[in-house]
A protein has these predicted regions:
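Beta-strand-loop-alpha-helix segment that lines the small-molecule cofactor/substrate pocket
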Residues: 73, 77-78, 84-85, 89-136, ...
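Predominantly a Rossmann-like dinucleotide-binding segment in NAD(P)-dependent oxidoreductases
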Residues: 135-231, 350
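Hydrophobic residues in well-ordered beta-strands that form the structural core
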Residues: 65, 103-104, 129-131, 252, ...
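Conserved SAM-binding strand-loop segment of SAM-dependent methyltransferases
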Residues: 60-67
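Contiguous beta-strand/loop segments that form the cofactor/metal-binding neighborhood of enzyme cores
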Residues: 2-3, 195-283, 311-322, 343, ...
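Glycine- and charged-residue-rich phosphate/anionic-cofactor binding loop of Rossmann-like
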Residues: 40-42, 297-301, 319-336
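N-terminal Rossmann-like dinucleotide-binding module
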Residues: 2-59, 377
């Protein structure tokens, strides 16, 4: 499955954007999308048009309305799909059919069949797909990935990642959906960690995992529903091994069962050194290197932007104009989804499960890549 990138777009200048979904996460995106000079947000849409209107007025977006308003807007080239996960594929497919490139908030899809169908539809139409997470484009992870690709740790051999918390029900006012099909610690947080591992090692070849849940019922701890019980449908502790096409391997823990919170732990070990990466749920953070013979970590200053959500949309827009491949592709997101579904299948079967898809590591951003710089001038 390819991502169309062979020729520059026929349009010139700033890339037009339409946002579908005016919920809470839209604020995090619009904080950046409305300030990147290479983008122009023309419209925000939502099933609840009053929500779209309020968000448009908050950010000075000239137009708002229902979903069709964004899909049919003549100046919109990229749809930023911030709908609920269950609607991601439906909205993305409608956008592709309308001739729009699509950036989707994670998850790319809830299952292999619909995700693969979306990839095929976009490929046939010559449409680009991009998907969160784009945190690996931030200064922290880009600095670490450049060190790996430059050979500073030798040949990458192993990876370890950890995400452990007591679970979100103590602070989240409506946490039940995080314990249902398509969520849990694996599908909620796994994309950040597994995407980082794919960037470090390349495609995942096979996985093995075990999982468990300590409780069938949990209790909401805050907000208007405090004290209400809800059913836990998915494993809340997952321990997964992955082997990559390169021969490297990794071990990851994703848990809502730990009284002690430990998150953002990512270490990559090579033949010459171990690299400690920043939290893959963030765009910045320290990078530390421990070479053979060292007695302590050496901190490597992070270089590059750490603007936050929307950097993947901007990279997609600039790549669209240049006719080059963007980095946070739909293929990458589908491969991570495929790996997570395979992990779930391994928990059920007790065996290794092959990951059929592939997604090579993306090219690093140039060190002088600057979101705040206008690069797409009219007529250029």
């Amino acid at each position: 499955m390819s991502t169309p990138a062979s020729t520059p777009s026929l349009r010139k200048g700033r890339v037009g954007v339409g946002v579908v979904g005016a919920g809470n996460i839209s604020k995090q995106y619009l904080d950046n999308l409305t300030t990147f000079p290479d983008l122009k947000v023309h419209v925000i849409a939502d099933l609840f048009e009053e929500a779209a209107k309020a968000r448009a007025q908050e950010y000075g977006i000239p137009e708002w309305g229902g979903v069709e308003k964004a899909l049919n807007h003549p100046d919109v080239e990229i749809i930023v799909n911030l709908t609920i996960p269950a609607a991601h594929v439906e909205v993305a497919t409608a956008a592709v059919n309308a001739g729009k490139h699509v950036w989707t908030e994670k998850p790319f899809s809830l299952d292999r069949e619909s995700g693969l169908g979306l990839l095929k539809t976009a490929d046939t139409a010559g449409i680009r797909l991009g998907c969160a997470p784009d945190t690996f484009l931030g200064a922290g992870l880009q600095t670490a990935l450049r060190l790996i690709q430059r050979g500073d740790i030798g040949t990458p051999l192993t990876g370890m990642t950890t995400f452990q918390t007591p679970g979100p029900e103590s602070w989240h006012p409506n946490p039940a959906f995080l314990f249902q099909y398509g969520a849990g610690p694996l599908f909620d947080m796994g994309p950040y960690y597994l995407t980082t591992l794919v960037q470090a090692f390349g495609s995942i070849r096979k996985v093995a995992a075990v999982g468990s849940k300590a409780k069938d019922v949990r209790v909401i701890g805050s907000g208007p529903k405090a004290g209400e019980e809800f059913t836990v449908e998915v494993p809340t502790h997952v321990s997964a091994m992955a082997q990559f096409e390169s021969g490297a391997s990794s071990h990851s823990v994703f848990s809502f069962e730990s009284p002690r919170t430990r998150m953002g732990f990512v270490e990559i070990t090579g033949t010459e050194a171990t690299l400690s990466l920043p939290d893959p749920n963030n765009f910045d953070g320290d990078v530390r290197l421990w070479r053979a013979g060292d007695e302590d970590w050496t901190t490597i200053p992070a270089t590059g932007p750490a603007n936050g959500r929307g950097m993947g949309v901007l990279d997609m827009a600039r790549s669209l104009r240049a006719g080059t491949l963007h980095r946070a592709t739909g293929n990458l997101a589908y491969h991570v989804l495929d790996a997570m579904v395979s992990i779930s299948e391994s928990m059920d079967s007790g065996t290794f499960v092959d990951v059929e898809s592939s997604a090579p590591a993306s090219a690093p951003l140039p060190e002088d890549w600057a979101p705040e710089t206008l690069t797409l001038e009219e007529g250029a």
